[in-house]
Amino acid sequence: NVARIAFNRPEVRNAFRPKTTSELLDALHDAQEDTSIGVVLLSAEGPSSKDGVWSFCSGGDQKARGEKGYVGDDGYHRLNILDAQRMIRFMPKAVICVVPGWAVGGGHSLHVVCDMTLASKEHAIFKQTDADVTSFDGGYGSAYLAKMVGQKRAREIFFLGRNYSAQEAFDMGMVNAVVPHD
């Protein structure tokens, strides 16, 4: 059986906030504990009703980011995305990321830590925004990306913040397959 976990905030490019990461951790834990589940699909709902753009995840919601980091609805500063990366990376089941559109910043790092990535030929775009938002990936995303594409290319991706198409991501070994969106 397959568990599908999907971000569902398409109006903000499926950006995560503290509540989103808590929900993601809960869903991953449930999938891990369910002995009938063999594969986890990590994906996203969309497109955005505002502009029709598809997104997997744009990383941390900058509107939830305060001077001391990301602030939850309860006023506490936390984002726990590293816990989600760790859980995905060490899940005793296959975790396949299905990228229907933009995979940006922390969303890009999430696809990197998955066992496999399938990218929409028509809509998937990959980008790191660390330099743009002055929030560098101190977790698994940067290390695993370097293993996938090499040190120099990984630094280029993280430091320059360029957009990469699904085909470019495939060509450099970042995704396993480029598939039709439908």
Model-assigned labels for residue ranges:
Residues 1-47:
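Conserved CoA-thioester-binding segment of acyl-CoA-metabolizing enzymes
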